[in-house]
């Protein structure tokens, strides 16, 4: 069993994911660049890997947008986030009415889902 934590980093000031990065003890994240060795990105959003993969074996991270054929509601498009009250990752979608607008993201749900984007590069998928 692999107990390593995996993260990905979105640099808001550059509108891109940082692929080669190091977190320092002071909380700064440095990025390797070809020009001056290392440069700092100050507006970083850190997203954790959930430990789950979708039906195409892609790693699911916080902020990913998934589509799943959910029995009760049909095709659902939602975003992955960590819900502190649940103590779990959930798939949350936009829904009005008295019914819940999320499901717990477990192995069965992940296996049935497909990553179609993320909240930074394809936010319109959630509209």
Where do the model's predicted regions map?
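Secondary-structure transition motif
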Residues: 1-127
């Amino acid at each position: 069993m692999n107990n390593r934590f995996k993260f990905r980093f979105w640099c808001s000031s550059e509108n891109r994911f940082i692929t080669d990065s190091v977190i320092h003890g002071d909380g700064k994240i440095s990025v390797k660049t070809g020009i001056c060795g290392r440069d700092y990105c100050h507006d970083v959003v850190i997203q954790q890997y959930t430990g789950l993969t979708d039906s195409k074996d892609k790693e699911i991270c916080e902020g990913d947008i998934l589509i799943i054929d959910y029995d009760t509601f049909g095709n659902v498009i939602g975003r992955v986030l960590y819900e502190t009250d649940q103590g779990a990752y959930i798939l949350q979608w936009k829904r009005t009415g008295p019914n819940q607008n999320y499901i717990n993201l477990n192995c069965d749900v992940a296996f049935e889902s497909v990553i179609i984007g993320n909240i930074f590069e394809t936010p319109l998928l959630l509209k």
